[in-house]
């Protein structure tokens, strides 16, 4: 990833505090730098979403990485992400070693689809390691704002590697009738298995279930839930991939992309306003919107995260990559703005439904 001019969609936050959660995990608490003007809605977020951080790199200029927000929009005043070192992870190690109070970091607006549709329901949360970060946001929000009960099954290597151990004890003491935390320690029980997780999850199989953690854990947890009878539409999984391109770079749309058909027309409804925009055939919908200064949601710009999903009302598009939308999503008309190019002469989409 090379250093390119930053787009107008890029925000700059300041690290107010770095909290050592465990020997290999840090929470970065952010604030808006003094004198900076960032509209409040640019930082508005939902529990389960993430921030994309621009991490400096001597080799490539910078790398972009997504980190879940462990703060809750209901209970916390400041955005917080929690980062755990990974063996070969440049960005996580750099942040754990170098992040400090006063440091400024470029970020993208909070994004992501790993979000409960309704906090007034019962939840089953399955997390391993740093997968606890979005679960903390969901858990705190559900308990403070919702009315349902929460069961958290949380796997770690040992007691010393449990991120948020103290905070979870405090929440359990505050909500003894609504929060149940079940710890799985590899030093005691071995690696989590589908059978073991299934035994713990079976009494709660009908709940909205959220899964986040390393790949093998998520596979075991998903298998456990399906075996226990949890409906597919109740299973929600968060997967992060390293980004290859630079989502922070400014977008440049060519006036003429050389297509004999000429540009298509995009009719886009966003935040209550409908825009009619020239759409070159080779350009991605998201890039066209950003080029016009529209604040369309996105994160990875690579078809992996689903943050840019938008509802297509009419017309046809082609998506180069789709790693996140299910067949049912496609049937409903959802498309990925970062991957969609026009097939028909006119395409109508809305972000407001």
Swiss-Prot record:
Record Gene3D superfamilies: 3.10.20.30, Nucleotide-binding domain of ferredoxin-NADP reductase (FNR) module, Translation factors
CDD domains documented for this protein: fer2, PA_degradation_oxidoreductase_like
Where would I find the 2Fe-2S ferredoxin-type domain in this sequence?
264-353
Which SUPFAM superfamilies does the UniProt entry name for this protein? 2Fe-2S ferredoxin-like, Ferredoxin reductase-like, C-terminal NADP-linked domain, Riboflavin synthase domain-like
Induction record: Induced by KstR.
Record-listed [2Fe-2S] cluster binding positions: 300, 305, 308, 338
* Cofactor binding note of this UniProt entry: Binds 1 FAD per subunit.
Enumerate the GO terms in the molecular function aspect. 2 iron, 2 sulfur cluster binding; 3-ketosteroid 9-alpha-monooxygenase activity; flavin adenine dinucleotide binding; metal ion binding
This protein's pathway reads:
Lipid metabolism; steroid biosynthesis
State the disulfide connectivity. Answer: none
Summary of the function given for this chain in its UniProt record: Involved in the degradation of cholesterol. Catalyzes the introduction of a 9a-hydroxyl moiety into 1,4-androstadiene-3,17-dione (ADD) to yield the 9alpha-hydroxy-1,4-androstadiene-3,17-dione (9OHADD) intermediate which spontaneously form 3-hydroxy-9,10-seconandrost-1,3,5(10)-triene-9,17-dione (HSA) via the meta-cleavage of ring B with concomitant aromatization of ring A.
- Its recorded name reads 3-ketosteroid-9-alpha-monooxygenase, ferredoxin reductase component
